Curated annotation (Swiss-Prot):
Record family assignment: Belongs to the RIN4 family.
Gene source species: Arabidopsis thaliana
Keyword Nucleotidyltransferase: no
Gene: NOI4
Disulphide-bonded residues: none
Keywords, sorted A to Z: Phosphoprotein
Any one Gene Ontology BP term: response to nematode
PTM annotation: Proteolytic cleaved by P.syringae pv tomato AvrRpt2 after Gly-12; this cleavage is critical for subsequent proteasome-dependent elimination.
Name this protein carries in UniProt: Protein NOI4
Xref: Pfam families: AvrRpt-cleavage (PF05627)
Transmembrane regions listed in the UniProt entry: none
Phosphoserine PTM positions: 44
Region named Disordered: 31-68
InterPro entries: RIN4/NOI4, TypeIII_avirulence_cleave
Amino acid sequence: MSDKGRPLPKFGEWDVNDPASAEGFTVIFNKARDEKKTGGKPGSPGKSSEGHVKSGGGDPSKPQPKKWLCCMQAPAVDS
């Protein structure tokens, strides 16, 4: 964002009677959102939620199957 010293305006501060006034806010909020996603570096790729790269040659655009683990224990029998 080019105006780093300027605080982010509060949501809804625009003039509700002039819808065109909201356009500037949309740009400001979109820039702030993008900077948050990229860690403040415009043009850099977003941070990955995973800390490692998966190997295995699967197609990354397809969802991976979920793996489940279910454990059961029989109740203790008193004798």
